[in-house]
Amino acid sequence: MTEFINRLQKVASNPNAFKKTGRGIERETLRFTLGASLSTKPHPEGVGSALTHKYITTDFAESLLEFITPVSNDVDTVLKQLEDVHHYTVSHMGDEKLWPLSMPCFVTHDDDITLAQYGESNVGKLKTTYREGLKRRYGSVMQVISGVHFNFSFSTEFWDELFGEQSEDQRKESVSDAYFALIRNYYRFGWLIPYFFGASPALCSSFIQGRETSMDFESLGKTYYLPYATSLRLSDLGYTNDAQSNLKISLNSVNEYVDGLNKAIRTPSEEFAKIGLKEGDKHIQLNSNVLQIENELYAPIRPKRVTKSGERPSEALERDGVEYIEVRSLDVNPYSPIGVNEDQVRFLDMFLTWTVLSDSAPMNDSEMACWKDNWNKIIEKGRKPGLELKIGCQGERLTQKAWAERVFEDLLVIAKEMDRVNGDDAYQQTHKRLSAMIDDPELTISGRLLAETKAAGGIGVIGCKLAVEHRETHLAHQYRFYTKQELDAEVERSVQAQKEIEANDKLSFSEYLEEYFSYLK
């Protein structure tokens, strides 16, 4: 019996180990107009304050909505919550629509994009100034790429069965070590996510206007594509930061990770210093370090803990260890009105369980570089027949198909255990549908989307068509989890909360920044 099977049987002996898994979803999407251009309207007034609303906020831009679900133990519940919040928002958007693709179209210049606005409070101004810094550092067009983030935590019962009886400190350390083991395996095998669910094989030419690229694109009118690509969003064309590539933050323990993060937020950048901190009285970045704040660190997966008021993410991790992980490699699923579907959630349940129960040796920088090379191959040519990937850095290779099949043998064992606990076959059905995609890459989201793009004559055409269909779906939706009254009440609460924050400010913005960044001294 393998160690993996042994560990799986341990945790599966308690039905609640899987039943109490925690899941939350964050979905980003751009508002755009009937004339197929980016919305220039402010955040819809009817959905409340973007600063304080629990479920409806904005990301980088005023037009870039972000929908957030609370933590749920049930797959159906988290999707119902997302559907309800989409319906409520679209009902307050007039004739504007939600862009259904990760990669933006119709955006040609940074100045087309209004930064997200959060009111007159110091915390609101800090959020907008941070975004101004991102704009000056990397450009706005790159920042309006949309994604889906999946937050995931194992249950207390899961850890109880896996680790047995422990003191509080021992448990904290064991759980953090297990989550970092998961993260290392995610880098080793997470390329399966863009293979199955990558949804950006093509992009509008406006996105790369004036940008250098070494990619050998084929064109179709104003659409550029790579014939076997899965997720150009995750490629060098997407969110990249050369300054960050030298940070080398360790994933071998929570202490090493926090040390690396603390160093990054204190490392000055000559390049960013040239931008300056102010133009007249206006702050244009929070500081000129490699990272303005910890959230600027780009990563396909992050260890997380809910922060207390005024606490930085690294301080929360240092205080009590890892509480959950945030998967950040999902493109927006264009075929789902809410950008993600049940199969994706169930796959991540199985895959993340497999990554935590499988062996996971410590990882050095050179090994990480080898695994990242596999990701890049899948991102740029993942559907190419016979594509070979590295097995670590030892020179051995295996076809992507053979490797996926090996992983799926283990995932089937997990699927059966999860279904046994739930009394149905939902995980095995997901496994079956995804197995078909291993055999036929054209069944993947990127394969399907590229075929439809070619048939329609361009990615923009597909985006507009799906946006109209999804808008009709959202408007016709009947509430399945929340009530209209509950969401109305949250709007009122959020507006009031913003007013209170603004009324309670005592410091000038400059004084507030001085105090906020006192930890850098």
Curated annotation (Swiss-Prot):
> Which pathway does UniProt place it in?
Sulfur metabolism; glutathione biosynthesis; glutathione from L-cysteine and L-glutamate: step 1/2
Name of the protein in question: Glutamate--cysteine ligase
What keywords does the record list, in alphabetical order?
ATP-binding, Glutathione biosynthesis, Ligase, Nucleotide-binding
- Gene source species: Aliivibrio fischeri (strain ATCC 700601 / ES114)
Q: What is its EC number?
A: 6.3.2.2
On whether ATP-binding is a keyword of this UniProt record, the answer is yes
Q: EC top class, in one word?
A: ligase
Question: GO cellular-component terms in the record?
Answer: cytosol
HAMAP family named among the record's database cross-references: Glu_cys_ligase
Q: Which reaction does it catalyse?
A: L-cysteine + L-glutamate + ATP = gamma-L-glutamyl-L-cysteine + ADP + phosphate + H(+)
Return the NCBIfam families for the record.
glu_cys_ligase
Gene Ontology BP terms: glutathione biosynthetic process
Q: Name one Pfam family in it.
A: Glu_cys_ligase
Q: Does the keyword ATP-binding apply?
A: yes
The UniProt entry's sequence similarity note says: Belongs to the glutamate--cysteine ligase type 1 family. Type 1 subfamily.
One MF term in the entry's GO annotations: glutamate-cysteine ligase activity
Taxonomy, superkingdom: Bacteria
